[in-house]
Amino acid sequence: VPQLCVYKMPRATCIHFVHSAQTSYIYTSTSSDTTRQQLNYLTDHYFAPLHLTPPEALPKAKEQFRNKYLAYNKGFFIFHHKSLYLLNTNLVIEEKNPSEVIDIDFLVVSFGCWMRYSDVSKQIHPRQVILSSDFPYSYRQIWIAECKKAHIPCHDVNTQGAFLCDL
């Protein structure tokens, strides 16, 4: 069963797109050396016990990637007909017609975003918000409260552990 996983990692965003036990892809916000160290931990404690082949690291140097399972372009991912947006910068807020708001399945909010959900929701309407482990505590509390008020499920990786979702 294909899965989306967002792991709790110190000072990093880590998104794992699992197609099968043999095929998966991982995006991390850290340098390749740090990513390799973190993947060693995941391999020993997660992939090996579950008989999963270690994932292919998505290249950060490229802003685009596409194969038959996964496509991404500048923070926007499509995997098994599900959309995910990685919000690690501030959006340029434009006054939009409500019909122009982008509907997505998952919004992963990470370090680099200094906006509130109430501002982001003017352009993006997620079905699920996931707060990455590197997202600052002060903003985390605001997002949790605003998501609750908007009736949007919000998963905090720091307090609730890894986000795992069958697709």
Which residues make up each language-model segment?
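Hydrophobic alpha-helical transmembrane segments in integral membrane proteins
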Residues: 1-14
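Extracytosolic and intramembrane catalytic regions of membrane-associated proteins
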Residues: 16-167
